[in-house]
Amino acid sequence: MKKVYVIGSLNMDLCISAPYCPKGGETLSGSGFIANEGGKGANQAAAAAKSGAEVYMCGCVGADPFGGRLVSALDDAGADTRYVRRAEGVSTGIAVIIVTGGENRIILDKGANAALCEEDIDRALENAGAGDVFLTQSENPVKIVGYALKRAKEKGLLTIFNPAPADPAAAEYFRFADIVVRPALKSC
């Protein structure tokens, strides 16, 4: 069976609905607060694992409770998390999502996602081979995403790139992607 390698983000999604976005200095009552495991990379890995694929997740979380929760959720989904590194001195990535009128507004703190490095990529792809599948997106530093796409392509993997969130610098790495996924809107 082919393997699926996901190199990407792991975030805690903190989502709340509000009638409108508060103005500076204003406190507003919200409702329906949800704390979900997320991050585009973690979501890809969980979905692929739940569909029966052999999935290896590579990413970076903080050495904090949110990081532990994210790794546990991926383990529960059936993904292999041996390539998820716990970084000291940095918090796990957080997405604060405010939903107003059915539309979301997201504030992202990349946190440990920004600590992903070339060594993490090399370690995760060490046993990858031709015909395996590689998924990534843009919630990690764009140069690391580009490095990962290039390494996966060199090893003969089918490379899939979801360039979200949008970063004009990511276009430089489209040449290493067999498939570029058009980003979609997200809701809680």
Show where each model-derived region lies.
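Glycine-rich phosphate/adenosyl-contacting loop at the front of the ribokinase-like
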Residues: 1-60, 65-72, 76-79
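Ribokinase/PfkB-type carbohydrate-kinase core domain
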Residues: 1-10, 72-86, 98-188
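Beta-strand->loop->alpha-helix junctions that form or flank phosphate-binding loops
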Residues: 32, 58-63, 82-91, 163-164
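Short alpha-helical
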Residues: 43, 64-65, 91, 142-143, ...
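Short alpha-helix plus adjacent loop in nuclease-associated cores
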Residues: 92-97
